[in-house]
Structure formats: C-alpha cells, structure tokens
Amino acid sequence: MRAHEYALDDDIVAIATALSPAALGIVRTSGSSSIERVASFFSRAQALTRARAHTFLHGWILDGKTRVDEVVLLVYRAPHSFTGEHAVEIICHGGVRTVQAVYRLCLAQGFRAAQRGEFSFRSFFHGKRDLTRIEAIQSLVDARTCAAQQQAVLHLSGALQQEIAALTRALLAFSATLQGEIEYPEDEETRVHDIDMRELEPLVERLRRLRACWQERALQRTGVRIVLGGCPNAGKSSLFNALLGQDRAIVSSVPGTTRDWLEADLDLSGIPVRLCDTAGLRVTDNPIEAQGVVRSEQLLQGADCVFYIINGRAGVQAADCAFLSDCAVPLVVVVTHNDLMSMSERIQVCQAVQPFISAPVLSCARSQDARGAGEQCLAGGKNGEVRDRAPRAFVCVSAKTHAGLDALRAQTLHLLHGGQVPYEELSLGSERQYVLVDAAVQALEHAQEAYARGFGLDAVVHDLEEALYHCGALTGEVHSEDILDALFEKLCVGK
C-alpha cells in the first residue's frame, strides 16, 4: 500500500520494538476507537476508557478469562499524541511469544496491521510534524556517530523547519513588495529602480550555507574504511585496541598471531569509521597464515585510508619501503613503540620514511606531556623523490601510553576531509532536502541575475515563487503523492 492510500479512518497497530528476547516490548496503537478496543481485553477497562491524556495504567492483558501478560498502558488523547489521534501504547514483557500474543489480540479486536511509516504519515497528515521532522526520525535511527545523532535531534526538535519557515516569511514579504510595485507602479516603467535587491542576498546566502553543509558532511553519511597493515609484530593489534579503547584483538610478541582480519566501528570526529586489523604482511609457508596475508592485501587495496604500521624499535624494513612505494590510497605511516624509542631511533625512522611522505607534519611526541623541540619530527618529501600520489602523513604513537593518538586522529581527519567539520551547525537531513534547497538557490540566483540584466519585475517574481515552492516542498506544505510514497516507505513498521 502506498502512503497516500493509507486508510486514515482505521485503528492501526504495530509492534514498535525489535521482535527478540528483551526486558520490554511495546505494541503501539492509534485511531479514534483505539482506547475502547484495547479496553476490551484489558483487566481495568473502565479505568482505561476514563483515563486522561498522558496517563499510565497498570493491569493485565486478557484473552477471555486467561491472563496473557502483566502490562503498563500509556494513554494519549487527541490531539496530544504523536499521530494527533487517540492512542494506547502497551508496554509488556519482551518475550517474543508474549509480544506476538498481545499483537494478535489487537488484530482480533479490529485493529488493522499498520503499514511502513503509517504512524508518521498520520502525524504529518494531522499537522503534528512537517516532513523535515519526519525524516529526522529515520535519521535518528540510522545515526552511527554522536554528531549524526545530535544533528538528527536538532531536526527532530524543529530547528530546520523553523529556519525554512523564517526564510519563507522573508521571501514572501520581499515578493509582496515586488507585487505591489507591479500592481501600483509609480510610472509607466515595469522596473522600479528603488527596489533594493540586496535584501535578497542574506536569504540566498543562508540557503547556500545549508547546501554547503550537506556537501561538507558527505563522509558523515557514507563513512570510511580504515585498514591497519604492516609487517608481523609491528603493533597493529595493539594500535587497533588502543583506538577502540578495548581489547578486541589478541596481542602477542609471537609474529603471525593475527591470522584473520577483525573489524570494529569507530567514531572519528563525527565520521563513522570501520576499522580493520589485518594479518602481518610477509611470505610464509603456513597455509592458514598465507590465506590471512592474501586477505590483508585485498583489504588494503580496497581501503579508503591505510594506517601502515612500522615497529619503531625494529626500524624501517625493505618490505615497508616496497609497500609505501606502491600504495595508491590515502595513507598514514604510524610508527609504534614511541615510548621505548631513543632519539637516535626516531631520527633514523624519520629519515627512512621521509621519501615516501608527500604531506608533512606530524607529532612524534614521546609522551602526552613531553616538551621540547627534540620531541617533534617533521617528515617531508625530498626534491625529486616524491611522486604524485594520494595524500600521506606520518605519526609516532605509543599504544601503551596513548601518546600520539590525538595527532593520528587529527591527521587522518585532515587527509580524508581537509580538517575539522563544525557538526554543531544546522545542516540538511536528506538528499531530498538537498535537491530542493539547491533548486531554491538556483531560482533566487536567477532572480538576481534577471533584475541585474534589466528584466521586468514579473520575471523576478516568477523566480521568487519558484523558490517559495521548493521551500514549501521541503517542509511538506506543498507535496506530491510520489514524494510522500518515497519518503514514508523508508520508515519501518511502528514508526
């Protein structure tokens, strides 16, 4: 069933929590008769039908005279609910059988099974949420980092809706001024020279900034895969654990301990990272380890960024130089065991790695509170020795003391994105929103150009009306059935 075909007169029900063993499960209902229908199988029927909005009731779900589960009901009265309708949420124990039994009782009492996104559609239909806040619900569910979660909450609270509403009011006021000049011209000229088109520029700039923020946050949406590579016993697994803040990989002084690759999620300043620890790169007669090496090579070739690990105590090996010469993806050379290295060892490693680094800069701080010029190393390519390649960086770290990890994160962010992203700034929440804002910007820029080239005010007003249409489509004030269908089918059942 498509969103615009939902039967709004039906009472609907859905299981709102994951259907798996858990402490609690929620069965969600909505509709004009939802309270009475739930009362028909609730032990305190009269108390439920008389309950005020936002009231909790404790009791039993009954199948005839048989008790099904001890529950708590949360009662909503229209219009003070998510959907704008009467609604009851049944909070039961989280066993799969129990939740299904309660759900089946709802269906038996005349509730219809809700479709994908139908609760949210009713919220939109009854004016409880605009489309930006509806989309924020799914963004909140999909958020993989704290920054994404905070941006979704910002949208859910109505910040984007309010921004677009303010822009719309300003555009309407400006358009009304132009309309007045057209309807009541002071002379025979269609164009009136005292119209200050500069008033339009701040509005265009605000929309441009929303568009730019969406483009700047591409990595926040797509995420990146960072693969740790290097020779056996270089310290890959130790660094993997240090970055995660937990012991996920087995660490041993025995070379070849890691035979298969491990993966874990990491939040890199708002960018979701899939971090991979791999088997050490070397020629081996062990068939199992050899398979691990092949997988490591494949993962390194397909990475968005490589952390190539070198044991600072062992120095740079021929195998390290071979890999650094051939690697074609963004790469950070990470020298480990920095807490155990002498100054001469640091200098030797820096000199050996220098020809392979095209982007200088990195910290080789010996400890978190180390000071002094001797504790820093800069690596930069020599003239004629650095070929064109993907961006690279060089950091010395200690997985034991965590010295240098902040520098590693900062350099990685710089390689992938070019610097820190101000995630607290309001942005757009979906590709649909980006397309509409981009269209609005183009319409307003066309209006500015039309006025500058001496076209009549009618042409300018036409462009303003087009921009207003796109702003209205963004919040849902104007919409088509196809847009609603595409948006609400992305939401899960129970949303």
UniProtKB/Swiss-Prot annotation:
Keywords: Cytoplasm, GTP-binding, Hydrolase, Magnesium, Metal-binding, Nucleotide-binding, Potassium, tRNA processing. (6S)-5-formyl-5,6,7,8-tetrahydrofolate binds at residues 28, 89, 128, 495. Binds 1 potassium ion per subunit. It holds the Pfam family TrmE_N. InterPro entries: G_TrmE (IPR031168), GTP-bd (IPR006073), GTP-bd_TrmE_N (IPR018948), GTPase_MnmE (IPR004520), MnmE_dom2 (IPR027368), MnmE_helical (IPR025867), P-loop_NTPase (IPR027417), Small_GTP-bd (IPR005225). Its EC number is 3.6.-.-. The keyword rRNA-binding does not apply. GO terms for biological process: tRNA methylation; tRNA wobble uridine modification. It is found in: Cytoplasm. One of its GO terms (molecular function) is GTP binding. Its cofactor is K(+). Its main location: cytoplasm. Residues 223-417 form the TrmE-type G domain. Belongs to the TRAFAC class TrmE-Era-EngA-EngB-Septin-like GTPase superfamily. TrmE GTPase family. Homodimer. Heterotetramer of two MnmE and two MnmG subunits. Exhibits a very high intrinsic GTPase hydrolysis rate. Involved in the addition of a carboxymethylaminomethyl (cmnm) group at the wobble position (U34) of certain tRNAs, forming tRNA-cmnm(5)s(2)U34. This is tRNA modification GTPase MnmE. The lineage of its organism: Bacteria, Pseudomonadati, Spirochaetota, Spirochaetia, Spirochaetales.
